[in-house]
């Protein structure tokens, strides 16, 4: 069960050991995070670095975000039946697919993850196009 790994104090080391050589999937789990704060902080960093407005493009702005080395998510799984992104990864989710699950996060398990990934696998990715 996912909950056991995430909330166990040894979970971080366990997950690192089991996924350290993974080169196919990145999993983002964010606690106490706000997308609006991240965008405001990125703007402040660019201003403090002396970047001129005409020098700012999408790539420049993306490099000022909290985790610029991580790729944008392909999939957001939103638990607890809420159908909103709730101030989460506002910049990075631009082209992500969204899957909404009724179960709350603490009860979300491997079977639920497999179902969400299966739903995602049947999507036609358009990256903003039609």
For every predicted segment, state its role:
Residues 1-130:
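Flexible, compositionally biased loop and terminal segments
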